Curated annotation (Swiss-Prot):
Gene Ontology CC terms: cytoplasm
Gene responsible for this protein: rlmH
EC code: 2.1.1.177
Name of the protein this chain belongs to: Ribosomal RNA large subunit methyltransferase H
Record function comment: Specifically methylates the pseudouridine at position 1915 (m3Psi1915) in 23S rRNA.
Native organism: Burkholderia lata (strain ATCC 17760 / DSM 23089 / LMG 22485 / NCIMB 9086 / R18194 / 383)
Amino acid sequence: MKLFILAVGHKMPGWIASGFDEYTKRMPPELRIELREIKPELRSGGRSAESVMAAERQKIEAALPKGARLVALDERGRDWTTMQLAQALPGWQQDGRDVAFVIGGADGLDPELKARADTLLRISSMTLPHGMVRVLLAEQLYRAWSITQNHPYHRA
């Protein structure tokens, strides 16, 4: 199984990339994390947020791995603890499908994409920069894996 992070946004600053890379390189080969950056749509010329999100949805759908479980990150999603993520991970591995976590653009994710998602997940109740979400998600995936392996990284 492979974990994909599809993120609408521009190239991130070096410190974000460095933090993200730190956690992705710690993951075992059977749970590699792959980042797919999706170029955001411009919101210019009176273009509505709805049309921007719809255009970004098309780009996201084109980048989604075929048959992948879709986990959409959204401020109105379910609030999972790290332990809940760790409990979900083995089940996802057993069903054999890749998992794609989607981080929307500045206006969020298109409602059609959210309705199609297998899971709507909230990373935080706080508003976070999208680059920071990449790092936090990668860290939480590593932490969840470490819990399933009784690795000393996670100390509860």
